[in-house]
Design a protein with these regions (language model features):
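Conserved catalytic or regulatory cores that recognize and/or transform ribose-phosphate-containing ligands
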Residues: 1-102
Length: 102
């Protein structure tokens, strides 16, 4: 079973919208690669309360850590216009991960 990392824009979306999109992406990824996938949980609902200068960078760092576990990375939605998604794409591409995109 392949491990799937989902990269998607989240700004301005509700939890329900994000989770619905993630499920749709999981289904598309399974159809594309022809096998079940295990989704790496990269949707964070908490923030540890640490003092930092940039919360988005903190989240991006956590995402890149999880990206290291992926066999396949799926870029969904309008990812090209999301700064964090573009950085995740660059990392996945530079390190030779299998990339699927909408």
């Amino acid at each position: 079973m392949a491990k799937l990392f989902i990269s998607q824009p989240m700004r301005g979306l509700t939890d329900e919208e994000i989770l619905k999109a993630r499920e749709e992406i999981r289904i598309r990824a399974e159809k594309t690669i022809g096998e079940p996938v295990e989704v790496i949980d990269s949707y964070f609902t908490d923030y540890p309360g640490e003092v930092c200068k940039s919360v988005p960078i903190w989240y991006l760092g956590k995402s890149i850590q999880l990206l290291s576990q992926a066999d396949v990375v799926y870029f969904g939605g309008d990812w090209r216009n999301a700064r964090g998604c573009r950085i995740e794409y660059q990392v996945a591409s530079d390190y030779g991960l299998v990339i699927l995109e909408e």
